[in-house]
Amino acid sequence: MLEPALKEQLKGIFAGLEADFTFDISVSASHESRAGLLELLEDVAECSTHITCVVNEGSGLKFAIWKNGHPTGITFRAIPNGHEFTSLLLAILNLDGKGKNFPDEAVCNRVKALKGPVHLVTYVSLTCTNCPDVVQALNAMTTLNPSITHEMVDGALYQDEVDALKIQGVPSVFADGKLLHVGRGEFGELLAKLEAQYGIDETKAETEVKEYDVIVAGGGPAGVSAAIYSARKGLR
């Protein structure tokens, strides 16, 4: 399924992996997409000695990512190709501590302070250009907070669920069965909605008070000049 050139790129991307990852696959022997899923994941696993596949018979089609023999909370009920292939790669890199899409430390601390358990399910279309950003943001949150789990679901493979939930647009994010978000979304926006629904653990919330000498509000020439002046003077 993967072109030889892409496999060579993946070997370079995965060269620095330190943890051992397993694609824990559960798929029906008669599922029409079984061969496609196994081919994709086995191709990815061939690109690193730190990635393996385990296949179990199941009633549907899904796989979970395990790290060093333990579940990570990230599950795909889909064949993550197309726009979602990057979501799979980033999930592995983030879990290994080498991802590039984490927010700043203050936002990460907010994620860690979320009260759990939180079970998220995101319904996507593999042709959707807005879906990967949401999937990747929620996977990153799952990596940061062990009380969060996240499933990405290809609606085309689970049309019965799409119909039952009356999903009209993608991505559609459900938090413990309750519709949380529909459409394009940024990390901070999604986090704010989760905080509103689940609350935060005050014992884990960031309590450090930061002091600043100056705050630059706005942009334009005046804002740029103020920022340059502050930097030259060593102001915080």
Listing of model-derived features with the role each one plays in the protein:
Residues 20, 98, 151, 156-158, ...:
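Catalytic cores of nucleotide-enabled group-transfer and carboxylate-activating enzymes in metabolic
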Residues 142, 227, 231:
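Gly/Ala-rich phosphate-binding loop of Rossmann-like dinucleotide-binding domains
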Residues 3-42, 111-152:
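Local sequence-structure signature of Cys/Sec-based thiol-disulfide redox active-site neighborhoods
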Residues 205-222:
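Beta1/beta-strand and adjacent pyrophosphate-binding region of the FAD-binding site
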Residues 215-217, 231-236:
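Glycine-rich FAD pyrophosphate-binding loop
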Residues 49-59, 146-160:
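Thiol-based oxidoreductase modules, predominantly thioredoxin-like and allied folds used
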Residues 65-99, 174-202:
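Non-catalytic, surface beta->alpha helical segment in thiol-disulfide oxidoreductase systems
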Residues 57-74, 159-176:
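Structural micro-motif
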